[in-house]
Amino acid sequence: MKQLYTVPFERNSERVKELRRQYVQRVMELEANQAPHEFIYIDEAGFNLAKRRRRGRNVIGKRATVDVPGQRGANITMCAAIANAGLLLHRCQVGPYNTERLLAFLNDLHQRLVPEQGQEGENMRTFVITWDNVAFHHLQAITTWFEVHPRLVSLFLPPYSPFLNPIEEFFSAWRWKVYDHQPHDQMSLLEAMDAGSRDITVDDCQGWIRHTRRFYPRCIDLDNIRWLAMAGGRLTSHSGLERYQRALRSVGKSRRPSASRYKAALTNQPEGRRRS
């Protein structure tokens, strides 16, 4: 028996695949445009004191344990924006983000990106805000804000497509860094969240953005894309993970596992035979 993964039936529907293709085409059109522009990726993620690493090391014969507070405390939500220049802005708030908090975040981001207020023109850099296509981002107040700030434009991601949003990997890596600080109360949790964000480098963000673009050809071809979030924040396909797991099980059954035996199992070839 194998572990079952829940897969939304619409995740690779014709409608979703067409929306992915349209999104990639829009990105390519912006890239081909001579007007200077920059893609900004925005999302929100929550955290509380009850969250910890689910695996750890232990002394032989003893359980691997970790101390946690007796109460989980209030959820803290962080809204963040990343680009090729790295982490541009992040704001932590107790409780969920509402319209007022999101507008305040956009205003702070606008002041950071467009310090010269009132300047407009054909050759001015445009900032493409790329985020999830959720109802919260379609509110009239948000739409009006973008109309008042023409240097920032909104681009919505297709549904069921986290592999196209590099900030998903940012939040995954950031969570592990927060776990390592082992916060014990709300104040230390806020400090750990800020410290974890500062540990994210420009190279990290650039690598995540490049990784999402590896899926563009498959979106253009309307392929079915199956993915799974792995440790370290890397989104990959189910097929690659299943091949990796089969190789581990095959080598684990051997009395004398070796690197060559593992490589042979991973490539589905007999041990000792070289690939032509």
Pin down the residues of each PLM region.
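RNase H-like polynucleotidyl transferase catalytic core
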Residues: R63-Q71, V148-P166, P183
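Extended, low-complexity cationic-aromatic segments
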Residues: K17-D108, I220-D223, W227
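Short, basic/hydrophobic alpha-helical segments
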Residues: L102-F127
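C-terminal anion-handling pockets and recognition modules
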Residues: P36-F39, I167-S276
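RNase H-like two-metal-ion nuclease catalytic core shared by retroviral integrases
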Residues: W131-N133, Q140, L155-Y179, M187
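Short, aromatic/basic amphipathic alpha-helical patches
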Residues: L139-H149
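Short, conserved catalytic/metal-binding motifs centered on acidic residues
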Residues: I40-G46, A80, L106, I129-V134, ...
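Major-groove recognition helix of helix-turn-helix-like DNA-binding domains
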Residues: M1-Q3
